[in-house]
Amino acid sequence: SEFGVNISNLTISEKHSTGVAGIFVNKKTGENAINVVPGAAGKITKSDIDNASQTIKESEIFLTQLEAPLDVVEYAIEIASSNNIDVILNPAPARKLEQKTFSMIDYFTPNETEASFYVEHKIETQEDAKKAANQLIDKGVKNVIITLGEKGVYFANEKQNFFTNAFDFKGKVVDTTGAGDGFNAGLAVALAEEKK
């Protein structure tokens, strides 16, 4: 297409509307709560993934999240992983994954709330993030990146772990909507460029 986005696997549903998300923003903190109505995205099937499998196999990075049916997302992850494509999973919204799926994830990028879901304890400190990352690595994830909002990011794999502070923009946060999406997009681009 004119902006360089491959839309060859785009399908239009005659039966279902485009998914929508109602986003409520706290004016004081900029934090949000999101209510999603998946629409057509909730109707994606394994057959749709089969139709797009060649695109997945030719990709440098496979980035996905959990707003589509879980069995379909896990199926797509399996295709990417079995073809040695780096998989980034942004587990939003947090949902129970099959144990085997964790070992197919190259980069697992939950925020602190999502990470808490998978390790069953709150993440409020760097030490909590370190403990959670180690638990996720024990499940089979290769690299864990827990985003901690204005506090920064915690990274861990079997060889190293570190915390990085968030940039201080010295301005008021108006709305955090899309912060995780932007982070994951930036990560995917950086990893793809590193492969070139």
Regions found by a protein language model. Give the residues of each.
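Conserved N-terminal subdomain of the carbohydrate kinase-like
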Residues: 1-60, 78
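Residue-level detector of short coil/turn "hinge" positions at structural boundaries
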Residues: 6-7, 87, 123, 143
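Short, structured patches in soluble enzyme cores that scaffold and shape functional sites
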Residues: 24-26, 36-39, 66-68, 91-93, ...
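Short, acidic/turn-prone active-site loops that include or flank metal/cofactor-
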Residues: 39-41, 92-94, 113-115, 167-170
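Conserved beta-alpha-beta core of the PfkB/ribokinase-like small-molecule kinase fold
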Residues: 48, 52, 60-131, 151-153
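Conserved phosphate-binding/catalytic region of the ribokinase-like
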Residues: 96-101, 126-196
